């Protein structure tokens, strides 16, 4: 029901002098939308006082004169005098109250000026405008409030709470968020990547302290932003993780007791698996490697040999135990569960691709959640972005503390002596894994010439506090995750550890010359498509 104040001199003080008080109180009571606030107290989304100009067309004596006066007073807020004149000519189609909205979200001062015009048939009511004070910072995570509904992110997920006037506090910290966004932008630009994404997570409980994509967008200009940049790809877009998945294969074999950290494997640089020849990323002579050495050098062949010791059925069981193939339960909407092919649907070559992160899909959020379990002693975490969902209750056990400790040590060696050398941080032990994953060409169903390069890791290695994931999509100037993504990880994780005052656990860091860049082996011949 639309009510308007009768055009009577007795009511004029209400529409003029009292208007300022009405507008000031409009968003402060229980009916005003709550703010979205960062963990460090910054308002990332807030509702500001405003006014709404409403016309009752049948009461307007001279629409042309009224339109001219409103256009001069409102400026760009309502359009030209001609556009306003059309609004004054008749009620909105289907509006039972016989009124027309001339302008919404009008600045309080302009709203007061409209009221002072004293135009018959024109009234001003309290309104509010949603604004995003930090511009593009964490745009996809925050989401957007439109005229009729909320779109994506926290705005949509916590719409009912916000509509009730309650603030929503995030686990996100704007300082870490800015550092992450800068690092992603620089990595994508330096290596001519199509896009980049990343996150920083507390390994103890899955609290997300930063989450970003590039290119990003500003929710203050939501309508102008391309649709493809508005998606929170960290939870909506699954991909084949490549070598960042190998630690889960190793953890499964260790947990099931089919290998020990002292076992050795004779690892060649290629091996046939059914109708596919699997090759390592670099040509090398046959070598004797422990499971840790296999991870250190990111050997495809060695990882498959470990997986064959375990068997496909038990491998799938362990993969599912880490949460792959199902939603993580993050407190955001739109999450994709990814795909883990059931063992019954495996082909003969599946044991040659799934252990090395091909032939299955995961979201970046699932990968981070799984790595948190590797890091924190083997407990599942539920990723979350708001303190409303914060929980200190331990999750179910995924792997034993012993297996977690062994894998942490292996991943530290990856950084200290292996492919992750560019992720070293002075003063800290760091554990992590590089990834260079081939992308499937959607037109052919076969692997194409584009890659996702990534690095995921945590620190300090033996008592992890935070993990970070960096992924760059389709870099053109370099191929390897150790070159493209690891330096960005180093910057972000180094900042995070210092910002949260995590005590150093190492004097200096290893400063040996890094291993030479790998020599790309000939492409493996792939006879069947990956579905």
Regions found by a protein language model. Give the residues of each.
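Beta-lactam-recognizing serine transpeptidase/beta-lactamase-like catalytic domain environment
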Residues: 198, 202-243, 248-474, 481, ...
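A short, charged, Gly/Pro-tolerant segment at domain boundaries
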Residues: 514-515
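Periplasmic/cell-envelope proteins involved in peptidoglycan metabolism and beta-lactam response
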Residues: 1-222, 313-323, 471-473, 478-510, ...
